[in-house]
Amino acid sequence: KRWFGYIQELGANTLRVYTILQDDFYNAFYEYNTAREAAGEEPLWLIHGVWVNDYVQFSHRDAYDDDFLQTLLEDSRTLVDILHGERVLSLGRGLGSGSYRNDVSRWVIGYILGVEWEDVTVAYTDHKYPERSSYQGEYMVTTADATPFEAMLARVGDNIIEYETTRYKQQRLVAFSNWPTTDPFYYSPATTFYRSKYSSINVENITPTEKFISGYFASYHVYPYYPDYLELDMEAAAYREEDLIEAYGESRYENILKVISNMGAADIY
């Protein structure tokens, strides 16, 4: 609870958690926010992730393998129960464990599903299942341009929305994790070839239905050191520094955010 106080003292109002933690975390989160609200103060909000373990991503499995997809679907439902204080989780599953009896759902803004996807997993899945490029669920559907991996994500999103809507009569914001390795942006042929930029995930190919009322947003990991495409792209040598600043902006963060916004993603985390 002391850490939660330090976080708010820094000026932050929202905490992101990547995976299911021990029950101590949620108990402390409940006690901290309950005390804050009783004192008439702003609580700390939570965005929760659903993790995919590294072994599954770096193994021979594709995204439709049971150890990948079914585990992701099950963990999503487990997380919903945990946040509503309706779950007991045993040791040995690669996640936190304990008796989750405190309902912290009212402070949960939404979910970020998945991790920094490995480009080889995405490419392998898309190559192996060309016939699975469509998913038409009750709460999320894919467009005609979707890939098999994006269709898998739509299924995962539809699953967590359907479960929470049906069991708890609630909905929350949903996003899918993404990062530069699998971003949907266009790069020069030289960069694409020499830097092995061969996988892409475009969440614009996943759309909500009218039944998904809460809405969704884009989640994109940005780093000051990765990728180094611009620095290593030989095409950049043909431009003066001021030309590059005008074209890309002084800040790589600013440039990437502009590119994402131009795609139509108005809300970015």
Residue ranges and their predicted role:
Residues 1-34:
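Active-site-adjacent substrate/metal-binding segments within catalytic domains
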